[in-house]
Structures are given as C-alpha cells and as structure tokens.
Amino acid sequence: DMRLISGIPPWCQMYFDRLSAKANGKKIKDIFKNFSLFVYGGVNFEPYRARIEESIGKKISTIETYPASEGFIAFQDAQQDKGLLLLADAGIFYEFIPTDEYFNENPTRLSLAEVELNKNYALIMSTNAGLWGYAIGDTVKFISKNPYKILV
C-alpha cells in the first residue's frame, strides 16, 4: 500500500508508467487506493504536472522541496502557498547576487537582510564558517521576508 511517493518528477513518471504497464493500464489510484501525496523537487514540476495527474487518475496533494547536493535549501510549508520556506538555520550561509550583476567582475553579494522582494538573485551557498562560497547555478526570487520564502 503506497500512500506517498517522493522524487524527481520525470523519474516518478517513469515509475508510474512501468506500474501501469504491469497492471494492464490501470491508473495509479486503482493500484494504490490510498495514494494521496507526491513530494517532489529537483526540477520545475509544471511541465510534468498534467501527465503525472493523468497517470495517477485523481487529484492528490503535492509538496515541493528544494534539495541540492550542497544542502537542503527550502520546502513548501503550506499546501496553498507556492513559495518555499528558506531554511536559514540549517548550517548554510546564503548570499545573493542580483542576476543583472552575476557576470560582473565583482558582483554585489547581499545577505538575507539585504534582499528585496520580487527581484531575481543568483544563489550563493557557503558553510556557516565561510569556508567557501559556491554559485549552485540557480536563481531565486523572494516573495516574503518574514518568514523568508522563495520561488526557484
């Protein structure tokens, strides 16, 4: 009895396709009657949403996470909220470079206290001891500063 699944949307879709094929084309809701939650991260879900919902065969709750090799960055803490709660107390020091300055020789690095709402920033992560600063290749936009919530 599978009640939830967590993963990267295209991999979950491949899993759903294999399950359906093994079950003579049944929808996931018919294979796992109590399936009700999909926790995802790693890529934008929207390009996969319609196909995954079709494979499942019913509306289910979803929760977005923002994991990275460098650390767990944020998660959706409210079902109706599109923003992700930034984990500001988990051993990662964040800095933010305005995207229009990213390729400058000495771009401005902003702390959490200095970011502005609805502006795009390149995300820089460091250890809390400041050992290194690493641009992970993602951009974020703050939609709240109390608490800090982002869109990736």
What are these regions (language model features)?
Residues 1-152:
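Active-site glycine/GP-rich loop and adjacent strand/helix microenvironment
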